[in-house]
Amino acid sequence: KSTLLHILGGVDRPTSGKVFVDGQDVYEQNEDELAVFRRRQVGLVYQFYNLIPVLTVEENITLPIRLDGRKINQERLKELLSTLKLVKRRKHLPSQLSGGQQQRVAIGRALINAPAIILADEPTGNLDTENTRDIMKLLRESNEVYRQTMILITHDREIAMQADRILEIQDGRL
């Protein structure tokens, strides 16, 4: 499942087959173009956060924008921090956060750009019931407002049932 997300998100190259986004084969791009594609078009939520330990919550969330040399939309950042319940933690480092808070930072980083594609590997796996509900609401709203394609991997049947389309992988087969 993680390999599938990495291939779809331009992180790992497939050994065979092609990945098309907006009619373009993603892997016909060189590494620099692929990096821009990932920063601008894909929001990745990893199962184990992948936060930069020396960056604050705010800096981790805005990393894709800063790597692109673009101006940060402070209203969007403020809105995300509020929704993610991280306003009071915005200057904290990942080591100063709980696992659930770190996951919310990772989700914020994936959503900050309003990318065309959101790829989420167990985005609510480390969250309590209330935060799970809030995150799923945020993902649904983002999907509707920005008309994003969202691929979410979960073992939680209740979360899966919220999807427009459900595909199951069993024993390595779709």
Predicted regions and their residues:
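ABC family nucleotide-binding domain
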Residues: 2-169
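Conserved switch/coupling elements of ABC/ABC-like ATPase nucleotide-binding domains
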Residues: 171-174
